[in-house]
Amino acid sequence: MIDTKSKFKIAIIDYNLSNLFSINNALSSLNFNTIITNSKKDILSSDLIVLPGVGAFNKAISNLKKTKTFDLLRSLHTHNKPIISICLGMQMLFESSEEFCKTSGLSIIKGDVHSFKKYKHSSIVPHIGWNDLLINDQNISIKKFSRLKKHIFNKKFYFIHSFFVKPKYKKDILTYTKYDDVVFCSSILKNNLLACQFHPEKSGNNGLKLIDSFIKSIN
């Protein structure tokens, strides 16, 4: 449990392709100590990592490698470092994406990334706006993070994306969301990793409470 928020250091990964300030402002409003960085020293000394993301998958992966954070993130997850990944940040955790050209990801989560355009017929792509989350009770980590349920049930969160993840294992899925005729994985919870396709930092109090609850549940 986190006793003193100001002493809990959060490293927001800067790989030159993301809107860092909205998540920084959200975490600061919760009184957490944040730093925007790609420094190995800062990342290693942090208590939690945030991997945000806006942009193209292949460019994002390339930038992670250029800033030497690609292998570092893989290593830290192996050692159970707490991580929050958002939108493209969530997609980069997977093995590959078909956006523009097939590109390998971090392979932290088994599965890959697909375009809505392959599955949708009547609704507009991208998926933009507020939508519900349906909890997957088969998730293997929900017992530890049980307090998250009350911040998900009957709450809406803000989405903006054209691609979605398809995890190999249902036990990694925290929530599903339905967009027209497609039911997709909208968040992952695995050990100390929370990954969201939606933007909690743009989801008002619902998003702030979800972030705060996850961090408070970390041992």
Model features per residue range: what roles?
Residues T34-S45:
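Short acidic low-complexity segments
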Residues I2, N192-N219:
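Acyltransferase
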Residues S6-A11:
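Extreme N-terminal starter segment of soluble prokaryotic enzymes
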Residues V182-L189:
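Short, surface-exposed beta-strand/loop micro-motifs that present aromatic residues
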Residues L48, G55-W130, D212:
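Cysteine-nucleophile active-site neighborhood
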Residues V50-P52, A195:
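Structural motif
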Residues S97-D181:
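Pocket-forming structural segment of enzyme catalytic cores
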Residues N154, L189-L193:
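Beta-strand-turn-beta hairpins that frame and shape the catalytic cleft
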